[in-house]
């Protein structure tokens, strides 16, 4: 080997050694030199794993436990070409960074958000206060807010006779890091639980690993499947605010316990200290005149029995006024939460089943739900569960309170009285059918549907024309204008008139509209023989596929043919069976609404 060869070999070995020192995720990065300079300046490590690049965690020379909960902030709206070399100087200006996690994409760019954990809680609060809307680039503002480090899981499907200790023991057998189990007693029978529990873990990572392990189909507890999901994290209220609270939250009360009994029990230490008591089912809020009286009552009555039930007493957590105002505004359909095209719950009521048809009740959505839905009613997981994802104060849905008695009349006076408008679903679209009728989705004004809240759910338009036709037929055929072919209208009208005269009695004056969708109910009516005449409705009849679509099919042309074709109802589709066979309307036909 010559001297030149040895020199080349040494230089290649040196290059290989230097490249080996570059951590994974930094090597080959667009700003590799800037990241290496940052690591050299601060002494922090940097590694990429699981789709995120971690800077620090812990910082050099760190001794002690992991930072407490509430030390992490979420950073959003990050330009995709901004990396740690620009973010770290900004965030370390307000406090010592314990760890920064930048979410990365496969192309080497960031995903637009990151998490910054500080060593102390007050530093995180300062970062939110000072760095929110910070201009990281000209015209590009960062969004900084507190990060929710959720360590709590919801577990459903628990046998109702199991006690807290039994549940804790069983969960600790299959998962690690369990700190506590919260079990609520049944309101009706305090000897039973409500069939679910909340499990608190020592860290978010431990909770995430437990959730993955307990997913349905992997592990059975007590011999059957369980339901697992994230629970709503506890509201983190500022300590200074909590120092002013003089309201107690009391739970696990008996249903028959009265407000007077609660007031007497909590006011025994200082007569007159209780201002008022508000009891809701099995929990209550007790308002005191001073914080000292509230703390004294809490310390003495927590864990004691009242009318045979063990009380749980804590200080009530107030709701952030700014957030509450935002939630209320969203619940009313204003502000950032724009009202989607969703059903109006003032739509016609079926007096026989007391159901609002036009939309299923198990999918109540839209800006009006704060009038009709309480917390937990959609998935029924109770206080603190993950059933209702929308943020809001505890005991409310979307930040709103239950309207209570008289809500229906107040609703009609307000949102129910709106100007009716037409809905043109697909402009300039005609759908050919097998009969001489062309169905064209028209601009139709539907009674009792307000201008803002439509009954038709918004859906993205298909890219292909043929897909659009199929999509329209299947999902958006509710308001239709049936336009018969003029060439076949006369023959169809004559045939329909003859068939109608033989089966359906002549009606001189059209009866009032029943206020319900008129559909071919002979296919579902019990003990009613189907009419054998196949052409009773003529060539222009368009059947409805779903009885939940509350719509009137009208003949836009030739009113005389309409009156003859539909047995004198002049535009309304009649019930397709003889009037003497069964009384109409049929109450049990519409139970599926």
UniProtKB/Swiss-Prot annotation:
Transmembrane segments: none annotated. It is found in: Nucleus; Cytoplasm. The modification Omega-N-methylarginine is found at residues 332, 394, 405. Residues 1-20 have a biased composition (Low complexity). The keyword Nucleotide-binding does not apply. The keyword Cytoplasm applies. Residues 71-149, 151-233, 246-318 form the RRM domain. Its main location: nucleus. InterPro entries: HnRNP_R/Q_splicing_fac, Nucleotide-bd_a/b_plait_sf, RBD_domain_sf, RBM47_RRM1, RBM47_RRM2, RBM47_RRM3, RRM_dom. This is RNA-binding protein 47. It comes from Homo sapiens. The lineage of its organism: Eukaryota, Metazoa, Chordata, Craniata, Vertebrata.
